[in-house]
Structure formats: C-alpha cells, structure tokens
Amino acid sequence: MRNDVHMGHKARKRFGQNFLNDPYIIDGIVSAINPRPGQNLVEIGPGLGAITEPVGREVDKFTVIELDRDLAERLRTHPELADKLTIHEGDAMRFDFTQLVKPNNKLRIFGNLPYNISTPLMFHLFEFHKDIQDMHFMLQKEVVNRLAAGPGSKAYGRLTVMAQYYCKVVPVLEVPPTAFVPPPKVDSAVVRLVPYETLPHPANNLQWLERVCREGFNQRRKTVRNCYKSLMSEQVLEELGVNPGMRPENLTLQQFVAMANWLDANHK
C-alpha cells in the first residue's frame, strides 16, 4: 500500500499534507485544546478530520478553514460533522479572522499546520492577537523549540521574539513521524500560544521591532555595538540597559523593545 494515501486520499506535496492517524496523540491534542460547547473554535487545515471528529463530539458548532477542495467536500458530506461545521474553503494565510469574531467570545484556533507555511501563518495570526483566546498547533519540533527558546540559546531568533511579544508559549507534547501518513522526515510537537490581554512590553512601532530583530539575528556573531552602529551609539545602548559588547542573541524581548522604542522616538 502506498504510504502517501490515507483513507482514500493521496497527500498533496504542494499543500504540505501529512495526515495524523495515531489515536493516543490525537487524544492528547484534543485534551490540550479542551473544547467546550459555546466556544468560538476554528480549525485550520482539518484534512481528513483526525482532530475535527473528536472535537465535533464535544461541541455543537465550529468553523474550519481548508484549502484543499476535495477535503472540504468530504467535510460537507461527513455524516457526523456536516451539520456542525461552517466551512471556509481557502487559504488561511489570506483569511481575515476578524470576520469570525463574536461579542465576548474570542477565537480558539487549532490545527495541524502544513510545515512549509507554519511560520508565515503564525505571523499572520499575530495580527489578530486581540481577537484570539488561544492557539494550539502541531508544528515541526524545531519550530516549537524556536518559539519557546530563551536568550542565548541556539534556537532563539526573530520568531522567538515576535511570538513571545504577543503570546505566552507553552510546549504541550512531542509527536514522532510514525504518527502520520505519510511520515514526515522530522519530529513534530504541539504548542499552546496564549495571546496576552495586555502586552507586557509594548512597542510603539512594530516595524522598528522587526527591524532590530532582523538586523540582530542576521548578524548573530557580531556584537550589539557593531550590529546597530548605523542606528544608535554605544552611549544610547548603555542608557537603554544594553551591553554593547554582548551578542544580539543574548538580548531579551524587553531590550529589543527598548531599542525599537528609542528608534521610533529618534528616527522620524
């Protein structure tokens, strides 16, 4: 039997499809999500319904976003799910999630994300952080490590800083390749992202925050002094509580934001 066919559907490489089929892992993910009736639940990329079906047993209504028209059609005719689902057929990367927001009922988003788009999709979702209660995603384990990393670690980078700017990051469980059909070439993991009600270190201009992150992490081996010499003096760095002799990978989120806010105030 071909290892890229599951439940009669051939996995499509261009959509980055790997179908989850391990009952133990599925139970662990659904327990982590803890779906309840009345919640504003949204699944990105339901695929063949491995998580969709058990979530559907817990709630009356929820929303799914599916790019693959064949899989969307399967869900429309699914004997258990058809009446419970609102199906949006399209690309989550271009989706306006504000259209799903209900009064006093923030979005709870979950999904087994295609690994080839997981990082840009998370950046897209961060734009809606005020409307999201939490997110649970299956991702490449390496990406989860980056999301949860601390300053000074090899995994610490731009994704870390931007994710932790918006969200509390909690790794939930690790998932081996054997849990999927076809098995991916990498280990996977589930992560919980909980957007802050109030940002702990708000930036006055996100473009400056993204720039100081980009310039710092693109030159990881340079000192802070050399990375940012065209933007701010050594004296300014010291006034901001930043050691000019350290490397950017050792800067905290708070320090990146302090630098971004100084640049916003002084580079008009």
Swiss-Prot record:
Localization per Swiss-Prot or TrEMBL: Cytoplasm
Of the GO CC terms on this record, one is: cytosol
SMART domains this protein is in? rADc
* PROSITE patterns documented for this protein: RRNA_A_DIMETH (PS01131), SAM_RNA_A_N6_MT (PS51689)
This entry's Gene Ontology molecular function terms read: 16S rRNA (adenine(1518)-N(6)/adenine(1519)-N(6))-dimethyltransferase activity; RNA binding
Query: Could you tell me the keywords of this UniProt record?
Result: Cytoplasm, Methyltransferase, RNA-binding, rRNA processing, S-adenosyl-L-methionine, Transferase
Instruction: Return the EC number.
Output: 2.1.1.182
Reactions mediated catalytically: adenosine(1518)/adenosine(1519) in 16S rRNA + 4 S-adenosyl-L-methionine = N(6)-dimethyladenosine(1518)/N(6)-dimethyladenosine(1519) in 16S rRNA + 4 S-adenosyl-L-homocysteine + 4 H(+)
Query: Keyword Cell division, does the record have it?
Result: no
Q: Does the keyword Methyltransferase apply?
A: yes
Purpose: Specifically dimethylates two adjacent adenosines (A1518 and A1519) in the loop of a conserved hairpin near the 3'-end of 16S rRNA in the 30S particle. May play a critical role in biogenesis of 30S subunits.
Family assignment from sequence similarity: Belongs to the class I-like SAM-binding methyltransferase superfamily. rRNA adenine N(6)-methyltransferase family. RsmA subfamily.
Name of the protein this chain belongs to: Ribosomal RNA small subunit methyltransferase A
